[in-house]
Design a protein with these regions (language model features):
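Signal-peptide-cleaved, periplasmic/extracellular N-terminal interaction regions immediately downstream
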Residues: 16-174
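Flexible glycine-/small-residue-rich
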Residues: 46-48, 67-69, 104-106, 129-132, ...
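A short, glycine/Asx- and small/polar-enriched loop/turn
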Residues: 122, 258-260, 348-353
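Catalytic-core regions of hydrolytic enzymes
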Residues: 146-300, 309-322, 368, 377, ...
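Bacterial N-terminal signal peptides
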Residues: 1-12
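Short, solvent-exposed loop/turn elements at domain surfaces
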Residues: 53-55, 74-75, 184-188, 274, ...
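Active-site-adjacent mobile loop/cap segments within catalytic or ligand-binding domains
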Residues: 305-402
Length: 402
C-alpha cells in the first residue's frame, strides 16, 4: 500500500510536463560501504537529488530504501558483504519505483541518514550510518514505525516476528562469556599440543554452568562450539543481547616461559607494559590470521557516546578489581595482575568488559593447572563470586526491559 502511494505520488506530474519528453530515470552511480560489525556507513552517489523513503524490517533484519525509477550503475564488487551488511539487492519494485535493500547481520538502527549535495562535483550523495543495537531496541523501532505508517498487515507481521520489549518482569543481570578464538583460529598452543581455543571453550562452559546457579543472573556465550567469530562480531553479540558484563577468556603463550599466573585486562589506548601491548597486538590480529580482512571503521565523534564510554570504563575497572580480589590467595596471579591495553574485543562503548588470561600455556606449571578440570572449577567459583558482587552493585538500569 505504502509503495503504491509512493509510486503514485511520483507519477502525478502536471499534464503540461507530461506532454514533453519524460524525465530520465534517476541514476545511482556508485555504492560504497565501510565499517565493521558494530557500525557501518553506506554512501550512494546519485546524478541528482533523490526523493526517497526508508523502512526497517525483521526476519531477516533489513533496511529498505524506496526510490523513484532508478538506473543502478553499481560495481558488483562494491556490494560484497562488509561490516553489518550481509547482502545488497536492488532493482525495479513497480511502475515508476525502484528499491535498494540491505540485509543486516542482526538488529540495527539507522543513526544518521542524510542526502547531501556534492561539494566538488555535480550530483548528490546518500550517507547512512547503521549501528548494531539490541533485539529489544530494534523491536521498539519497528513498533514506532508501525505507529507512523499505519496498521498494515505487513508491519504487524514484522513486529510479531521480532523480540518485543519486556513484559514488566525484572530484567536479569546478563553476562556474556566469550571463549577466545575458535574454528580456523586456534589461538596459542602449548609445547604438548594443547590448543587455546579448546581450553577457553571448556572453561567458558564451566563458568557458564557455575553462574547459572545464581538467581537473577542470565548467562550467554559468544560461541558454544568450535566456531570462528570476528572480534567485532563478539562485541556485537554482547550489545545485541544488552549484556551488563562481557568476559573474554584466554590462555596465551609468551616468550618468557617463567611468567605464569592469571591476568585481568581492561581496555586502554596506552598499554600498561610491554607484555600487555604484545598481547593486545597478537589478539587483535586474530581476524587477519583467520583470513578475515580488517575493515575500516567510520570515524565517530559523539559527546554522549564518549560519556557512555567513560562510565562503562569505570565499571570495567571496578569489576577487574573485584576479580583480582577474589583470586588473590586462591590461584596464582601474575605480578601486577590488573593490566590494560587496546584489545579490540573490549571496545563496546556500553558494556563493561574485561579479558581474563587464566594462565600461560607457555609455562609448564600453568599448562598443568589449566588442563585440570578441578582447578578450572575453583577458578570459575572465584570469578562467579566477583560477578555476583558486581551484579549486586550494578543492576540493569532498565529493570522492566521496556
Amino acid at each position: 500500500v505504502l509503495l503504491a502511494l509512493f509510486c503514485l505520488s511520483l507519477a502525478n506530474v502536471p499534464s503540461t510536463f507530461a506532454a514533453d519528453s519524460p524525465a530520465p530515470p534517476l541514476s545511482a552511480l556508485t555504492f560504497r560501504m565501510a565499517g565493521d560489525d558494530l557500525r557501518t556507513r553506506i554512501v550512494v552517489m546519485f546524478d541528482r537529488e533523490p526523493k526517497l523513503s526508508t523502512r526497517l524490517f525483521g526476519n531477516p533484519h533489513r533496511l529498505v530504501i524506496d526510490l523513484p525509477e532508478t538506473r543502478f550503475g553499481f560495481d558488483e564488487k562494491s556490494l560484497e558483504a562488509r561490516g553489518l551488511v550481509s547482502h545488497v539487492r536492488y532493482g525495479l519494485a513497480g511502475k515508476g519505483c525502484s528499491r535498494l535493500i540491505l540485509t543486516l547481520r542482526g538488529p540495527f538502527d539507522v543513526e544518521n541518514l542524510r542526502v547531501l549535495k556534492n561539494e566538488n562535483a555535480s550530483g548528490y550523495r546518500l550517507v547512512a550510518d547503521i549501528v548494531a543495537t539490541s533485539d529489544r531496541k530494534f523491536a521498539e523501532k519497528l513498533k514506532e514505525q508501525k505507529g507512523k505508517t499505519g496498521s498494515t498487515e505487513r508491519t504487524r507481521q514484522q513486529v510479531a516476528g521480532s523480540a518485543l520489549p519486556g513484559d514488566g518482569k525484572p530484567r536479569p543481570f546478563t553476562v556474556m562469556i566469550d571463549p577466545g578464538h575458535g574454528g580456523i583460529d586456534s589461538g596459542a598452543e602449548s609445547l604438548s599440543g594443547i590448543k587455546e581455543k579448546n581450553l577457553t571453550l571448556a572453561f567458558g562452559k564451566e563458568l557458564r554452568d557455575r553462574l547459572s546457579h545464581e538467581r537473577n543472573i542470565k548467562v550467554l556465550m559468544t560461541r558454544e562450539d568450535d566456531t570462528f567469530l570476528r572480534l567485532a562480531e563478539r562485541v556485537r553479540l554482547a550489545r545485541q543481547h544488552e549484556a551488563d558484563l562481557f568476559i573474554s577468556i584466554h590462555a596465551d603463550t609468551i616468550n618468557q616461559h617463567d611468567i605464569r599466573g592469571a591476568t585481568v585486562y581492561t581496555i586502554s589506548d596506552k598499554a600498561s607494559d610491554a607484555v600487555a601491548r604484545a598481547m593486545a597486538e597478537r589478539e587483535n590480529k586474530s581476524d587477519s590470521l583467520a583470513g578475515a580482512l580488517p575493515e575500516e571503521q567510520p570515524e565517530v565523534t559523539d559527546i554522549l557516546l564518549d560519556l557512555t564510554r567513560r562510565e562503562t570504563h569505570t565499571f570495567s575497572l571496578s569489576f577487574a578489581e573485584k576479580v583480582i580480589g577474589e583470586l588473590q590467595g586462591q590461584v596464582n596471579l601474575i605480578n601486577n595482575p590488573h593490566r590494560f591495553a587496546g584489545f579490540q574485543v573490549l571496545r563496546a562503548p556500553d558494556v563493561p568488559s574485561v579479558l581474563i588470561e587464566i594462565g600461560y600455556l607457555s609455562n609448564p606449571e600453568d599448562e598443568k593447572l589449566i588442563s585440570n578440570p578441578e582447578w578450572r572449577k575453583k577458578l570459575a567459583d572465584r570469578i562467579a563470586l566477583a560477578v555476583k558482587a558486581f551484579a549486586a552493585r550494578k543492576r540493569p538500569s532498565n529493570l522492566s526491559g521496556g
